[in-house]
């Protein structure tokens, strides 16, 4: 979410927050905090979500930062739409993910954490696009944000903006309806 904030602070970028979350909750039946509100707020139809995310960038922006969670792609869905994007995987150490996730919701199994799905997604993106997705560790961004954001921007052939390093404290209109449950730390950052 902090990465989404970083990109949202650019003047040329529109962000969307976890567009497949309602689909995931609907499909799996998992009882996450605010589940019914999420399902009411977003489409639960895979095709509608794909149509949205491959459509025109809203507000005539040049960049569309889409925050996805790998485990929201449940099983076997067609993800050929990744060919329209510059793909990037943000990874975190399992210990950090487990601690963070468990504070918000019970862990039903390894699939909740997304590691197996990340490996599969990495391979699928390579097969569909012909190139490996850009992968970086969240710890690197936290340790030296400017250095790693510059590396990322260079890789994606976009200009780095110092605005990516700071953002106003508080929630955003672009935050998912689930933000009160999951985003406390980033809202206060």
Predicted segments, located by residue:
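Short, well-ordered alpha-helix to beta-strand connector turns
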Residues: 10, 61, 84-85
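PAPS-dependent sulfotransferase catalytic core
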Residues: 1-58
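Short, flexible loop segments at the rims of nucleotide/cofactor-binding pockets, characterized by
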Residues: 38-44, 66-67, 111-112
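Small-residue-rich helix-loop
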Residues: 168-169
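PAPS-dependent sulfotransferase catalytic domain
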Residues: 69-163, 175-187
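Glycine-rich phosphate-binding loop used to anchor ATP phosphates in small-molecule kinases
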Residues: 52-77
């Amino acid at each position: 979410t902090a990465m989404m904030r970083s990109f949202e602070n650019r003047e040329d970028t529109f962000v969307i927050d976890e567009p497949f979350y309602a689909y995931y909750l609907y499909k799996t039946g998992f009882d996450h905090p605010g589940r019914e509100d999420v399902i009411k707020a977003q489409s639960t139809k895979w095709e509608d979500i794909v149509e949205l995310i491959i459509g025109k960038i809203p507000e005539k922006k040049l960049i569309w930062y889409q925050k996805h969670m790998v485990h929201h792609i449940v099983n076997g869905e067609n993800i050929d739409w990744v060919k329209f994007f510059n793909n990037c995987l943000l990874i975190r150490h399992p210990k950090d993910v487990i601690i963070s996730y468990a504070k918000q919701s019970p862990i039903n199994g390894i699939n909740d954490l997304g590691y197996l799905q990340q490996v599969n997604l990495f391979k699928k993106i390579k097969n569909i696009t012909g190139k490996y997705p850009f992968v970086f560790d969240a710890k690197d961004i936290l340790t030296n944000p400017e250095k790693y954001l510059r590396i990322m921007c260079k890789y994606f052939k976009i200009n780095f903006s110092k605005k990516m390093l700071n953002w106003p404290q508080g929630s955003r209109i672009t935050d998912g309806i689930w933000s009160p449950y999951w985003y406390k730390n980033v809202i206060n950052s």
